[in-house]
């Protein structure tokens, strides 16, 4: 029997209740619902956005209200997978991108609404989902809902809060807003705002009805993961009566955000994988915050730990692999379980390859201070340009002419006050450079999205006086990732490890005992 078949069989057996009698958990069906509803212990189909396939896909996850019966400091793989499903559902739907430029309710939160309904949660509130995806604020969208049950004679309220981590458009530029202090400015600002939103939701719920024992279930993927990681520390301090053992936090593909100085309100179990002298612990310490990280994924390495940044809680690394049997199993999953575009695990980066990419980046940027002073504004505006789309660009595949590019650049956060003729000269030079850059992306089949953004991206870099070769290289990588173009390049292979499907497959394939304290590749 192949490893995957055994794991599936074991999961089905457990889901059917074939546990030792003494270990059986209370069934959700025995509960009385006061708000929302109790649901059977079962697998539920949740939708998620797939940037890899340019589509909305669905996947099945096990859920039970009894997953919250134990202390949050106890790692629970079934709860982790359910959280990943909810975190992915919190992303903007792919279908809603047809209204990319619009402000208002256009279906961005359709997947998380559906997920909450299937799992029996009610009183859904959405924060920041109605912004146009052309906006670039230091915020994050978040979906919150609750259910209040009477289980075993005790009243319990479970509040789910999931932060959007994909499909957020020009908000992407905030991922590069490190700032000059000892914490990532963009992530901290988003976490502080959402703390107030969640506190308001809890207080309003408590006014309507006693909550009983409050349990908070939080999660996020990528940008959503780091904001949820910071939120986890803050809500324990901000919400009276909320015990740490009742705050269940699972994050995925989590960037680092905090240095050791300042911001004590955003720190909890900080850098929990390491001792005070920086050495790796033998095993995880106690925490209610679990960060699940694919060993080859480059995003959790930004900003570099060598610059003094770490996460709250316990980092659990999913292994990369070069083991032939494991690759065969994973590639079978990649062909059958995640949409029309096969996911080839043998092509994804190992931890060593990703480390080499990061080393080259650190050598280029030199230090955190040098990055902030010389590159941060340029990279933020280059990225913002990659994610701005007008109605004509979305619906008619319009490619801006040079005059229109000049006007767009004059709306960017850091270029509003730059001399008109300096911007114009940069755009004209970028038009000339663009043909060579597009050929480096795909000489025969240049995607329309790459054609739309190549001149604006190049022009921004030139406006800031970056070297032409550096501007071309940065633009190439942005174009390849936006256009989902694979290439035999370690940086692209490391970036493609970031796809949500990679995390789902690795979580389902590897047992918790095979999670690692640091990035690892199996052979």
Residue ranges of model-derived segments:
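C-terminal segment of N-terminal export signals and the immediately downstream linker at the start
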Residues: 1, 21-43
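N-terminal export signals
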Residues: 5-28
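Short, polar loop/linker segments at the starts of domains and inter-domain junctions
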Residues: 100-103, 176-183, 304-311
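C-terminal catalytic-base region of ester-bond hydrolases, centering on the histidine
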Residues: 298-523
């Amino acid at each position: 029997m192949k490893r995957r078949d055994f794991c599936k069989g074991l999961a089905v057996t457990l889901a059917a209740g074939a546990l030792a009698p003494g270990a059986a958990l209370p069934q959700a069906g025995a509960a009385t619902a006061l708000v929302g509803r109790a649901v059977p212990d079962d697998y539920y189909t949740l939708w998620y956005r797939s940037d890899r396939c340019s589509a909305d896909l669905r996947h099945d996850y096990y859920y039970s209200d009894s997953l919250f019966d134990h202390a949050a400091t106890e790692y629970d793989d079934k709860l982790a997978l359910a959280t990943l499903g909810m975190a992915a559902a919190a992303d903007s739907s792919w279908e809603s991108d047809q209204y990319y430029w619009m402000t208002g309710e256009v279906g961005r939160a359709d997947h998380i609404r559906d997920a909450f309904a299937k799992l029996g949660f009610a009183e859904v509130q959405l924060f920041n989902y109605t912004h146009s995806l052309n906006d670039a604020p230091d915020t994050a969208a978040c979906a919150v809902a609750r259910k209040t049950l009477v289980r075993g004679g005790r009243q319990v309220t479970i509040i789910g809060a999931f932060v959007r981590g994909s499909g957020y458009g020009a908000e992407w530029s905030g991922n590069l807003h490190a700032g000059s202090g000892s914490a990532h400015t963009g992530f901290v600002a988003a976490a502080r705002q959402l703390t107030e939103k969640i506190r308001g939701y809890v207080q309003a719920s408590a006014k309507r009805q006693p909550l009983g024992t409050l349990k908070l279930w939080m999660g996020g993927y990528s940008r959503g993961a780091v904001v949820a990681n910071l939120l986890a520390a803050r809500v324990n301090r901000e919400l009276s009566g909320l015990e740490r053992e009742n705050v269940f936090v699972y994050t995925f593909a989590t960037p680092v955000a905090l240095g050791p100085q300042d911001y004590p309100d955003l720190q909890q179990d900080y850098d929990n994988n390491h001792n005070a002298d920086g050495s790796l612990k033998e095993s995880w310490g106690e925490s209610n915050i679990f960060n699940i990280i694919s060993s080859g994924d480059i995003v959790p390495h930004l900003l570099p730990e060598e610059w003094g940044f770490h996460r709250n809680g316990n980092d659990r690394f999913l292994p990369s692999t070069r083991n032939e049997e494991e690759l065969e199993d994973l590639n079978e999953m990649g062909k059958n379980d995640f949409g029309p575009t096969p996911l080839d695990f043998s092509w994804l980066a190992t931890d060593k390859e990703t480390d080499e990419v990061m080393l080259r980046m650190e050598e280029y940027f030199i230090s955190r201070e040098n990055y902030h002073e010389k590159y941060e504004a340029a990279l933020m505006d280059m990225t913002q340009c990659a994610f701005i789309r007008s109605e004509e660009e979305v619906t008619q595949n319009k490619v801006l002419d040079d005059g229109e590019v000049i006007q767009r650049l004059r709306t960017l956060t850091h270029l509003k006050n730059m001399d008109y003729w300096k911007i114009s000269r940069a755009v004209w030079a970028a038009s000339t450079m663009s043909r060579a850059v597009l050929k480096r992306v795909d000489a025969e089949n240049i995607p329309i999205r790459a054609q739309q953004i190549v001149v604006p991206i190049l022009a921004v870099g030139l406006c800031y006086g970056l070297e032409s070769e550096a501007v071309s290289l940065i633009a190439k990588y942005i174009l390849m990732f936006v256009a989902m173009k694979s290439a035999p390049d370690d940086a692209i292979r490391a970036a493609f490890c970031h796809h949500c499907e990679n995390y789902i497959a690795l979580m389902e394939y590897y047992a918790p005992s095979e999670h690692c304290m640091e990035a690892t590749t199996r052979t």
